[in-house]
Structures are given as structure tokens and as C-alpha cells.
Curated annotation (Swiss-Prot):
InterPro entries: CheY-like_superfamily, OmpR/PhoB-type_DNA-bd, Sig_transdc_resp-reg_receiver, WalR-like, WH-like_DNA-bd_sf
PROSITE patterns the UniProt entry points to: OMPR_PHOB (PS51755), RESPONSE_REGULATORY (PS50110)
CDD domains: REC_OmpR (cd17574), trans_reg_C (cd00383)
Name the UniProt record assigns to this protein: Nisin biosynthesis regulatory protein NisR
Matching SMART domains: REC (SM00448), Trans_reg_C (SM00862)
Gene from which the chain derives: nisR
Lineage per the UniProt record: Bacteria, Bacillati, Bacillota, Bacilli, Lactobacillales
């Protein structure tokens, strides 16, 4: 299977370097250099992963992410020279699934891409292994093959990481998961900023269920988080 990757960056040289590095690993790569408003959502559909630069002249990558997140669940890796913990947490909080800071090596870039794609494949494979395609928990329904969550038939626009966290908690509704448990399930590497992002993801999940007067995640003080049906 050939995986399709979209790179969005207004620096032509960086686009060329990233495109070449990924094509050498047999990825099919498309690029966008001059993104501007209004966005055409079809420009971002049909890909297995998106690499999105944050600091661009016409529109920031964070704004692009906010505008397309309700329409696509494709993993998004932010690429940016903004490298503080708060920058990373903010990027993940508005819909990013991972973050790579400039300057970076092409080996690091490829490793990030491969880790995210492998995780998506493992998640899809797990559904088939356990032969569960639907999970009903009160008004909340998981469509596991589609990696989609609905409340009374209405789809909740979760990012890949948000879905992973919520689905993990729903597997064993009586278990309390520590932040370490959740982190180990959704990330393949350690980073303090990524670890801190777990709380932000929990906040974003809750905010997306709030219009339905549902809070699917209970905080167990001093321990962690638990499914709250």
C-alpha cells in the first residue's frame, strides 16, 4: 500500500527537501505552497497524513487546522520554529496530532511520519483482530472501523489523538487510567510537552460533548481519568 502525504509550507526549499526525503521512503507526496483564504477542503482530503507548517505568510497553519478539523480526521503533524512547551501544547490543543520543531533532520521527519502512520494502521488492525465494529455506551456510539464517535446519531468531530484517548477509556469503563497510561497508549516517544498535552486533549474532548450535556470523562483526583457514562 502506498501512503499519501500532503505537505503545506510556503518555503519552496523546505518543501523540496521534505518531499524528496519522503518519496525516497516510497510515500506519495503532494505539496501546497501558497495556501490562502477561502480554503478549499478538497485540497486536504484523500491523504493519510498532513505535514503543516505553522508560520506562513498568507495564513498560519494553526488557522488552517482549525478550519479543516471538522471535516477531516487525518493525522496532522505541525512543523514549526516555535519550540516552547506552550507553543507545542497549543498546537496539539487546536487539533494537531504531533509536532516537530525546526531545525530538524530529515531522519527525524521520516521517523515522525512513520510512527504516526504505523499507529493508525495498528489501530485499524486492532478492530479486525477483536472483531468489534461498534460499541454502544449509553447515548455514545463508537464505530471502530471508521474511528468515529456519535452522540444520538450526531458525529463528534474528534482529532485522531482525541479519539484514541476516548476509545481507550471506553475499553474498560471501570478502570482508572493514569496520565502515564494514556500517554503510553497514544505516543511512541517521551516529551514533557507531549505529556502535558494529555490534559489539553481531555479538555477538548469534554468541550466537544458539552453541547449534548455529556461529560464522558471523569477526573479521579490524585489518580487519573475514567470513563463516565
Amino acid at each position: 500500500m502506498v501512503y499519501k502525504i500532503l505537505i503545506v509550507d510556503d518555503d519552496q526549499e523546505i518543501l523540496k527537501l521534505m518531499k524528496t526525503a519522503l518519496e525516497m521512503r516510497n510515500y506519495e507526496v503532494a505539496t501546497h505552497q501558497n495556501i490562502s483564504l477561502p480554503l478549499d477542503i478538497t485540497d486536504f482530503q484523500g491523504f493519510d497524513l498532513i505535514l503543516l507548517d505553522i508560520m506562513m505568510s498568507n495564513i498560519e497553519g494553526t488557522e488552517i487546522c482549525k478550519r479543516i478539523r471538522r471535516e477531516i480526521s487525518t493525522p496532522i503533524i505541525f512543523v514549526s520554529a516555535k519550540d516552547t512547551e506552550e507553543d507545542i501544547i497549543n498546537g496539539l490543543g487546536i487539533g494537531g496530532d504531533d509536532y516537530i520543531t525546526k531545525p530538524f533532520s530529515l531522519k527525524q521527519l521520516v521517523a515522525k511520519v512513520e510512527a504516526n502512520i504505523k499507529r493508525e494502521e495498528r489501530n485499524k488492525h486492532a478492530v479486525h483482530v477483536f472483531s468489534e465494529i461498534r460499541r454502544d455506551l449509553g447515548p455514545i456510539t463508537f464505530y471502530l472501523e471508521e474511528r468515529r464517535v456519535c452522540v444520538n446519531g450526531q458525529t463528534i468531530p474528534l482529532t485522531c489523538r482525541e479519539y484514541d484517548i476516548l476509545e481507550l477509556l471506553s475499553q474498560r469503563t471501570s478502570k482508572v487510567y493514569t496520565r502515564e497510561d494514556i500517554y503510553d497508549d497514544v505516543y511512541d516517544e517521551y516529551s514533557n510537552a507531549l505529556f502535558r498535552s494529555i490534559s489539553e486533549y481531555i479538555y477538548q474532548i469534554r468541550s466537544k460533548f458539552a453541547p449534548y450535556d455529556i461529560n464522558p470523562i471523569k477526573t479521579v483526583r490524585g489518580l487519573g481519568y475514567q470513563w463516565h457514562g
